[in-house]
Regions:
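Residue-level signature of outer-membrane beta-barrel architecture
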Residues: 24, 58, 94-96, 130-132, ...
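Start-of-domain marker
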Residues: 10-67, 76
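Outer-membrane beta-barrel "beta-signal"
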Residues: 92, 190-197
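Transmembrane beta-strands of outer-membrane beta-barrel pores
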Residues: 36-42, 70-76, 96-100, 109-113, ...
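Detector for outer-membrane/organellar transmembrane beta-barrel domains
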Residues: 94, 100-147
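Repeated loop/turn-to-beta-strand initiation elements of outer-membrane beta-barrel proteins
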Residues: 29-34, 63-68, 98-103, 134-138, ...
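Solvent-exposed loop/turn segments connecting transmembrane beta-strands
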Residues: 9-16, 40-49, 77-83, 113-120, ...
């Protein structure tokens, strides 16, 4: 057992994710979304990827939002080799609140194209947050399951993310999100320190 735990500990990586978001509200129901993201890897010693995303969000009901978007990633493969990959996604997010507890359920389909290959995944996320009527600080915890839609058995988790964090409202439509995320994707895990603004 000791040997097994040592192997897993050695395979874990420590990384950072930093995301800058710009959202533009066209009308009460429709918003344009964009973000720029930087990720590191190998114990924060190297750049992992630079990502750019654009998309749209439509509030169908007070509790339901529909989304669609496109992303491109410039990824570091090592040995001075970088490559682009492309991804599109669409999904739905349902939000419910009872007193101070906010519950958010999101289902997202994504397909990634990488040098002629494609990979389709379904991402299911549950988020629980403390959301008081007054106050700007909202701690939360989320769990996200990635399921492969290609040749893997559907009910096998391809990747798992566990993410505690704190959102701080800086202005009416501007918030700071500071989080820790543990990602497990066989055979190794990732410890991620992140900031989104």
């Amino acid at each position: 057992a000791g040997m097994t735990s040592t192997v897993f500990a050695q395979s874990d990586d420590f990384t950072t994710w930093t995301k800058f978001k710009v959202n533009y509200k066209i009308d009460p129901r429709f918003s344009l979304l964009s973000n720029l993201e930087f990720r590191t890897k190998d114990d924060v010693s190297r750049m992992d990827r630079l990502g750019l995303a654009i998309g749209g969000e439509y509030r169908a009901y007070s509790f339901l939002k529909l989304e669609a978007g496109y992303e491109t990633h410039f990824r570091n493969l090592g040995d001075s080799e970088w490559k682009f990959r492309h991804r599109y996604n669409f999904g739905a997010t349902a939000s419910f609140q009872y007193q101070w507890l906010k519950i958010v359920l999101r289902e997202r389909f994504q397909q990634t194209f990488d040098r002629g290959d494609s990979k389709a995944r379904l991402r299911s996320r549950l988020k629980l947050a403390y959301a008081p009527e007054k106050g700007i600080v909202s701690p939360y915890f989320s769990i996200e399951i990635y399921q492969s839609l290609d040749d893997a058995p559907f009910w096998r988790a391809d990747r798992m993310r566990y993410r505690p964090g704190v959102e701080i409202a800086l202005a009416k439509r501007w918030a700071l999100d500071v989080f820790y995320c543990y990602q497990y994707e066989s055979p190794k895990g990732k410890h991620i320190a992140g900031v989104e603004i």
